[in-house]
Amino acid sequence: GCAFQVGEQCFNIGRLVTFLSDLDIRVPGMTVDRWCGSSMEAIHIAAGKIAMGSGKAFICGGVESMTRVKTGFDPLPYPYSDKEKQNPNLYLSMGITAENVAKKYNISRTEQQEFALESHRKANEAQQKEKFVGEITKIDNCETDENIRPNSTMEKLDSLKLAFDQNGTVT
């Protein structure tokens, strides 16, 4: 999965990965672009192919590095069509989607923060018990998920600024 196929993550990176990994040249590769759901969609495609018997094993994952996408990058290399201009909600970021879900289901900022705090607590506990060892491939001495915040508190979460809608709830 890779939504912004630029720089070294362009030109069908899924195929390049199979080639650069010294897999047999007959091993196919493909890149899936479903924006924030690209990696998950790749997994769903592989699961579907296994279920219907068109393969036994697949390598799936996300290869996108947002630091490789230049600020101001326009993912649409062509001018917006009239139909796209008339439908501004066609491409919503995950942040705006989160705001919409929170609004639709009346999920307060406090509820979101409580969920986040518990999520980090559980993730930290699992990491301490080495539950993720088989899930993380060691790269350049990185053996753990550095995004888990074991010292997070409600006070720290309360101090975060709203990120997407100044009248919203998502930080």
Predicted regions and their residues:
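Flexible glycine-/small-residue-enriched beta->alpha junction loops
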Residues: A47, A51-V101
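Conserved catalytic cysteine-centered active-site region
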Residues: C2-G55, N89-I96, N151-T171
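Short, well-ordered secondary-structure micro-motifs
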Residues: Q9-C10, V69-T71, T144-D145, S152
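Glycine-rich nucleotide phosphate-binding loop and flanking beta-alpha elements
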Residues: V6, S65-T67, A123
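A short beta-alpha structural unit
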Residues: G1-A3, N141-C142
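Short glycine-/small-residue-rich flexible loop motifs, especially phosphate/cofactor-binding loops
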Residues: R15, E99, N124
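Active-site-proximal alpha-helical scaffold in enzymes
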Residues: V32-V63, A102-K129
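N-terminal extracellular/periplasmic Venus flytrap/periplasmic-binding protein-like
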Residues: E111-T171
